[in-house]
């Protein structure tokens, strides 16, 4: 899996961004297509916001549109991240590993930690709304310069209310 590197001083330099996938910047998710099936997952930068993943909760969906929530992930400080789909289509598979070992989402975001597989309805259209690893890194550097809340605000949901 080739990777696009960044200048050592760039804020995104510490993150792996494989060049063999497409990225949806505002949601910080990626997609990789093979034989009409898109494997999707979260990016390493989003994983840093989560820091710790005690739970991945899948939403009961069969068909998804771009941006629609596939799952939510609880992170540190009770923050919940919505994992939005970068492609439209029919859900083929949810990663069963994440139920048993949710930490795989962060430990191997581009490998065993994928979130779902989707039969893409129109990959060409969806791909046009995504960016390459190089473009995502550039967007990420600009957004990180404005602050983490600005950069990751599109994926974050409100903290969960404390249990009574």
Model-found features: residue ranges?
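Non-catalytic terminal segments and appended small domains
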Residues: 1-60, 66-69, 77-83, 90-164
């Amino acid at each position: 899996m080739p990777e696009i590197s960044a200048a050592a001083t760039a804020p995104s330099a510490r993150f792996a961004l494989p060049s063999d996938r497409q990225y949806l910047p505002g949601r910080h998710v990626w997609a990789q297509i093979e034989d009409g099936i898109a494997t999707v997952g979260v990016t390493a930068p989003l994983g840093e916001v989560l820091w710790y993943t005690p739970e991945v909760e899948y939403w009961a969906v069969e068909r998804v549109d771009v941006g629609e929530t596939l799952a939510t992930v609880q992170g540190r400080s009770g923050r919940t991240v919505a994992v939005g789909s970068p492609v439209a289509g029919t859900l083929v598979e949810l990663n069963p590993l994440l139920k048993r070992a949710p930490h795989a989402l962060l430990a191997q975001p581009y490998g065993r930690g994928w979130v779902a597989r989707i039969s893409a309805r129109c990959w060409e259209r969806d791909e046009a709304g995504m960016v390459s690893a190089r473009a995502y890194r550039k967007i990420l550097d600009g957004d990180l310069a404005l602050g983490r809340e600005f950069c990751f605000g599109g994926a974050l949901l409100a903290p969960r209310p404390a249990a009574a």
